[in-house]
């Protein structure tokens, strides 16, 4: 095999490896988000309990998990309700979701955006999750909801508060 052939094959195998890595990141991010929303499907869908710090760390990147946890502790100390009172994954306190559509876009190395669309009790809903891949796996860096005519974010709730 001559030198050009070696260089050619190295390039081909490198491109195949890069493509496999990109598709792997896409598949793992998609699986992470789909697992969340599958917990909300159907009348018996219990959703995701975010009632412990461990649960927060399982789904959110450390900085956002810490903001939510700190807010809860401060609210409890003051005898008040926490800033986040509904479920951030469905932007509601109650849900009836038959199915969901998930679109995923990689936005950079170890970053992706997931757009989830569903009807909650016949109300069309769109949730956008900013994802970050950590050594533990994919985590949510922020969630955006369309409310009235403006967009609000989970992180924004705690920055304003």
Name each model feature, range by range:
Residues 3-7:
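N-terminal export leaders
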Residues 18-54:
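Short, low-complexity N-terminal intrinsically disordered segments enriched in polar/charged residues
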Residues 28-32, 55, 63, 67, ...:
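Exposed alpha-helical structural elements
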Residues 60-123:
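Surface-exposed, charged secondary-structure patches
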Residues 10-17:
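Bacterial N-terminal signal peptides
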Residues 35, 39-46, 58-63, 67, ...:
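Structured segments of extracytoplasmic/periplasmic soluble domains
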């Amino acid at each position: 095999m001559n030198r050009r052939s070696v260089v050619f094959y190295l390039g081909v195998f490198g491109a195949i490896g890069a493509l496999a890595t990109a598709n792997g990141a896409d598949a793992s991010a998609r699986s992470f988000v789909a697992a969340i929303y599958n917990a909300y499907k159907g009348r018996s869908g219990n959703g995701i309990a975010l009632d412990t710090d461990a649960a927060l760390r399982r789904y959110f990147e450390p900085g956002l998990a810490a903001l939510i946890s700190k807010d809860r502790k401060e609210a409890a100390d003051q005898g008040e309700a926490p800033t986040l009172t509904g479920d951030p994954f469905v932007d509601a306190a109650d849900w009836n979701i038959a199915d969901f559509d998930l679109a995923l876009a990689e936005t950079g190395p170890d970053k992706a955006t997931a757009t989830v669309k569903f009807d909650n009790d016949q109300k069309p809903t769109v949730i956008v999750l900013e994802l970050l891949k950590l050594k533990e796996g994919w985590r949510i860096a922020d969630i955006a909801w369309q409310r009235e005519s403006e967009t609000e974010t989970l992180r924004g709730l705690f920055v304003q508060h």
